[in-house]
Structure formats: structure tokens, C-alpha cells
Amino acid sequence: MISRKIISTINSKTFYNKSLSYCTVNNNKNTTININNNNEKPKIKTGILMLNLGGPSKLEEVEPFLTRLFTDKEIFKLPFQKYTGTLIAKRRSNAVMKLYEAIGGGSPIRKWTEKQGELLSSMMDKISPETAPHKHYIGFRYSDPLIADTLDQMENDNVERVVAFSQYPQYSCTTTGSSLNNLWKTLEEKQMQSKFKWSVIDRWQDHKGFIDATIHKIKKAYNQFNSKLRELDIDDVDANNNNNNNKPVLVFSAHSLPMSTVEKGDPYPQEVAETVCRVMDGLGIRDEETGKPLEYILAWQSKVGPLPWLSPKTSFVIEQLAKKGRNAIVIPIAFTSDHIETLSEIDIELQHLAKKCGMKLLVRSESLNDDPLIISAMADLVNTHLKSNKTIHSNQYHLKCPGCKDDSTFCRTISNPIQALKL
């Protein structure tokens, strides 16, 4: 529908335009006319598809979420995958529901992704009018809105170009790779390969805006730590006469991975480590007495099952620090918004463990959520990406994991790329 306001005093006549319907204007009256364009839809010039694994927004979504998760061969390799994964999901759903009940009855990840997307699109319209209008879309892997439904919405909106924007700063085949693989496969299944022109933001672990936003949150947490330390009046000398109780250890916590995935060459651990190093290089917080930077460690959370995963576990690190009389600031380094890993695992389970082990003070650095710094970082990422004449993905995008033997994966390709590059 195209609306045009025509305010004029003209002779009564009927006119016709090839792309418009017949319209009649009356004599000597100010007339407002809505003219239907039946041949053209208003276009969304740039769609921003925000990719994430998702999370159940309501308790009744928990079991379907777990079923999609445990039947995904890119995440878990199970015998008789569909049957076994469905059975595991059914058995775990009640326990997982209780975790979501404790954080408000569902994951806030959709809420935060919507908020980030709205702010991002609005900012993009201002800083990049030539690629406007921009509209964000959400494509979750295991919960609504699923990618298949979002593609239908984009088709209905007449989107021209889409940036597939991973909400995981560090690339892993189990997160970004799985989402992209599902995206390209779904396009093929729906015979929509030629509907949109695509490009990909597949990793951004070293982006300055992301690093700066993380540093900002750590500094805020450090100030909170010192304030709470004064309130608690904690003695700053431990049992070994080490003057270190008032110096927190920075515990960077990221979602873990099975070692079987890591040993295939998944780049996630090295990219998380790169983020940590860049944050520490720019943090600038130093001990007032020694002038040295704060001590830090990278740990891993959310292990599932009995098989080996990345270590040390975040819970193990907290236990050991507590035994040594140390305190900690925990920093979620691979998440851009709050969800069950921050609100339940860190804020509830890890805090309980810290108290049980005798740790006097554990503070969590806030998630990025809708902080203006992370929105600006995302806008800079997308804007730079759109302005590039050559780059439609990262330099590392086409490099498959050395141990990957699955020739059916699409995760290192791009369906109908925006530019005619050799893929």
C-alpha cells in the first residue's frame, strides 16, 4: 500500500498511472487520496538476521527446546540420535523447568535480542541512510522464532539484502556454525535460495567496541566489589599472611565445549582466549600497592554429561580460590545478554557454591544486554560490513575444522551471496 496525500484545488477529473489504481478528485475541495499500488510492496532494503541458539521464553517451551537441542548432531553425537535425544529431553525437562522457574519462568534471551535489534536498526537508519530502511529479525536454532518462520516473514516484508549476524562473538561449529548450517539448509528446503542476497558476520571476538563494552562492565563490577568489600570489612590478610584478600581474581567464564569438538579444531577456545587477552590489555586496572594488573583466569561452565569438556570448570576455580582465601569477579565473556547461564548458573549456583566454600565475596560483571556501548559496537560492525566492497564474511570463514568429516554441512558456504566472489 502506497499512501500519497494530495491537497489541491483542481478541476474534477479521473486519472490513471500504470502502477496506480484509478482515482477521482473532486472540484474545489481539499482532498486526501490513498492510492493503492498493487504491483509493488514497500521494500526493506537491509534485513539484519540475529542468529542465536535461543531459549524457552515460557515453561511449556522447555521440552521442545531441549528436544531440538539434544537431537542436533552438530551439538551432541548420540546413538539413534532422534530417539535418544528425545528421551533425554523428556527426562531432563522437569529439572530444567525448575531452573527457569527460579529466574522468572523463562529465558529473557528473546526479550534482550529484540531490544538489541530494535536499537541496532534504529541506529543503522541514522548512520547509514543509503542502506536504510533496516529491520532486525531473530532466527533462533531451538526456540521461537525459528529460522524457517523468520525466512517467511522476511519474504513477506520484501527484504532485499540480509546480513546473517551471529550473536556469538567467538565462532564455534556448535553455535554460529550450527545456526548458519541450519539457515542455508532451510533456504534450500524452502526453495528460497534466490529470495535474498546474503552476507555474514560470523565472528567479532576482537572488535574494539565489544572489548570496550566488556571493559566498561568489568570496571563497574570492580567498583561494586570494592564497595561491598568495605561494607563487609574483610581482613585483607589471609592465613598465609598474603596481603591479597582485597584483590579480586578476574574469572572469565565462557560456555564449555566437549573435547571431542575441540580436538577436531574448533576455533572457539582460541577466539575466547583472544577476547580475554584484548580485554586485559585494555582494562588498565592496577593494584594500588604493587602497580601490577589484576590476576585473571579463563574458565568454562555449562558442562553436560560424563565425557571430557574444556577445563578448568568455573565451579572448580571458585572452589580453589575460596580455599586460598581469595575473592572473585566472574565475567561472562562469551554471552552478549542474560540467560540461564548467567542468571542461574552464576547468580544462583555459583554464588551458593562460593558461600559453601567460604568465599567472602563473589561479584558478577553485568551482561551487556542493551548497554549503549554494545549497541554502538553492533552498529559499527554492521555498518563497516555493509560499507565493505569486498568482505562478505571473515577471513577465517571458509576454513573448515581439520577433523571435520561431515561433507553435508553448509556452515562454511553462503547461499546467494551479495557479491560475485569465489566461494
Curated annotation (Swiss-Prot):
HAMAP family: Ferrochelatase (MF_00323)
Recorded family membership: Belongs to the ferrochelatase family.
Quaternary state and interactors: Monomer.
Cell compartments where the protein resides: Mitochondrion inner membrane
Domain of life: Eukaryota
Mode of membrane association: Peripheral membrane protein
Gene name of the record: hemH
Catalysis performed (reactions): heme b + 2 H(+) = protoporphyrin IX + Fe(2+)
Cofactor: [2Fe-2S] cluster
This protein's name: Ferrochelatase, mitochondrial
GO molecular function terms listed in the Swiss-Prot or TrEMBL record: 2 iron, 2 sulfur cluster binding; ferrochelatase activity; metal ion binding
Disulfide bonds: none
Pfam families noted in UniProt: Ferrochelatase
Transit peptide region: 1-29
Residues given in the record as [2Fe-2S] cluster binding sites: 173, 401, 404, 411
Species per Swiss-Prot/TrEMBL record: Dictyostelium discoideum (Social amoeba)
GO biological process, one term: heme biosynthetic process
Keywords, alphabetical: 2Fe-2S, Heme biosynthesis, Iron, Iron-sulfur, Lyase, Membrane, Metal-binding, Mitochondrion, Mitochondrion inner membrane, Porphyrin biosynthesis, Transit peptide
Known EC number: 4.98.1.1
